[in-house]
Regions:
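Compositionally biased terminal segments of proteins
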Residues: 1-291
């Protein structure tokens, strides 16, 4: 899954939030001029793919927009931020080194923009240490894979951007859940949404035409088949190191039980605990296939 996906288009019936487009219009050419490959991540990527491309229902609302930014040095990252601030539309946030605040002139609303750098500044343990003190450490495991497996989405006009694919986004969510699951359930809730939506997000024909074994294994339950297919696809976009990391995670009964419980707690139908557990097991089976 190395950028082989066809170009995606926004459904006229599910237009993108205009504020998102207004953020992307100045950011895209500035990132290109600074030679910074980037992709849209987080909840914005989720909604672009699930809602705006495939027409599925909106998920958990959020106003911030996340980006993964590939840079070779901290100087290159600083230059990108300086050029964005110089437009007058973005301002630095002293409380968070990765954050800019976009002032939406059309609405008067301020939108947090998180720019997560990786690549040349990433340590062997997949972390980055923010200068100058280097005492703020951030885990960027999965970002290389998310960029490599990102998909192209035409936003309208002459604007086309890279967006984290659903497998890439799921990988990032697994890493985030592993890091902060004792502080918040939101990553588990997002993972549950991805698992339950994958079949309907452009994979129905694929399941019937190329993955009939999955449909038969789950008695033609599309959600369960989609969950295992997502697990397989996540494994396919992983580097060997990332794959070892997530396979170790899903092999832990204690961690899986905690993930399942958090999904149940965040579900609109907590009484469906058994169904959630089956979906998590199907997803994990996909990740562990051929291991």
């Amino acid at each position: 899954m190395k950028n082989e996906s066809p170009q995606h288009f926004i459904r006229p019936s599910s237009p993108v939030d205009p504020a998102v487009v207004r953020v992307l219009r100045p950011l895209d050419p500035i990132a290109r001029a600074a030679d910074c490959a980037y992709f849209v991540a987080g909840a914005t990527a989720r909604d672009l793919i699930l809602v705006n491309v495939h027409g599925l229902r909106p998920g958990r609302a959020t106003r911030d927009i996340d980006f993964g930014i590939a840079v070779e040095s901290w100087d290159q990252f600083a230059l990108l931020k300086e050029r964005l601030v110089a437009t007058g539309d973005f301002a630095s946030d002293r409380r968070a080194l990765q954050r800019l605040i976009y002032s939406d002139q059309a609405t008067g609303i301020s939108i947090p923009i998180d720019l997560i750098p990786f690549r040349g500044i990433t340590s062997a343990d997949s972390t980055i240490e923010w200068p100058p003190s280097r005492d703020i450490v951030m885990n960027v495991a999965g970002f290389e894979e998310a960029l490599a497996s990102s998909v192209s989405v035409e936003m309208g006009g002459d604007l086309t951007v890279r967006v984290a694919s659903l497998p890439g986004l799921t990988l990032l969510k697994l890493v985030a859940w592993s890091d902060r699951s004792r502080e918040t359930n939101k990553d588990a809730a997002d993972l549950h949404r991805l698992l339950t939506s994958y079949a309907d997000a452009g994979n129905t024909d694929r399941l019937y035409e190329r993955e009939m074994d999955l449909l038969q294994a789950f008695d033609f339950d599309m959600e369960l088949a989609g969950a295992e297919l997502l697990g397989r696809d996540v494994a396919s976009v992983c580097s060997p190191g990332a794959l070892d990391q997530i396979r170790s995670l899903v092999k832990s009964e204690r961690e899986l039980e905690r993930l399942t419980n958090q999904m149940i707690q965040s579900s609109a139908y907590p009484e469906a605990a058994a169904a959630v557990a089956r979906m998590v097991n199907a997803f994990c089976r996909g990740i562990l296939k051929d291991s």
